[in-house]
A protein has these predicted regions:
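Non-transmembrane functional regions of envelope-associated proteins
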Residues: 1-211
């Protein structure tokens, strides 16, 4: 009887072990279908050659403003910058960059810093019981000049136990039960001029998010 009890007690530990969790993730991977590019989104990387051409990094905000204008002239209906701008530009280009961010729906990134500060909560409607989701320990916001003229979203990509990224949260919660939108969620919100998130929950957590 003692052996049977011991085996039963060990089963949850085995099921939650790292090798077992990795196996579960690999099985999950087999069910994920490869998605073909839609052609609606384009990723533009800043390369080492770009940095060399500009004489170093970070680029002056006036240069970023020109890039923003160039993208718009090439047909972009929205621009997302996966770069944060918490400090003022020593070259004095924040005003012109902020102006160009307002030409089309735009989003700039925020990143976690663990210092317990958070952006002002946005409009959120929760249908169902409260759930916490992924909790952030602090976010570094962007410069007021920029964030007041565009949207900012949290760039976060937590890894699984095998150090691969499979899931990117749409919203992240704070210890005081507010919600921080992710970068991708803000892109959608900007393009469709949405003001409020509707979060539907169930016993398992967040069921769906409507924007």
């Amino acid at each position: 009887k003692k052996k049977k009890i011991l085996i039963i007690l060990l089963l949850p530990l085995i099921y939650q072990s790292v090798p077992t969790e990795i196996l579960k993730l690999k099985i999950f991977d087999t069910f994920v279908k490869k998605q073909e590019p839609s052609g609606n989104f384009v990723i533009l990387n800043i390369t080492e050659q770009d940095v060399e051409n500009e004489g170093g990094y970070p680029f002056p905000r006036k240069t970023l403003a020109q890039i923003q204008v160039d993208l718009i002239n090439e047909g972009a209906i929205g621009v997302g910058w996966v770069i944060s701008f918490p400090q003022a530009d020593r070259m004095g280009g924040d005003e012109v960059f902020a102006q160009t961010l307002g030409y089309v729906p735009s989003v700039i990134a925020m990143f976690e810093d663990g210092k317990g500060n958070y952006p002002k909560p946005t409009g959120t409607v929760v249908k169902g019981s409260h759930v916490s989701g992924i909790v952030s320990m602090g976010v570094k916001e962007n410069l007021n000049t920029l964030k007041d003229n565009t949207l900012q979203g949290l760039a976060i990509a937590p890894t699984e136990v095998d150090q691969l990224v499979r899931r990117i949260p749409l919203l992240v919660s704070t210890p005081n039960n507010n919600w921080i939108p992710s970068f991708g969620t803000q892109i959608y919100k900007a393009l469709f001029s949405v003001k409020t998130y509707i979060i539907k929950t169930n016993d398992n957590g967040i069921e769906e998010i409507s924007i």
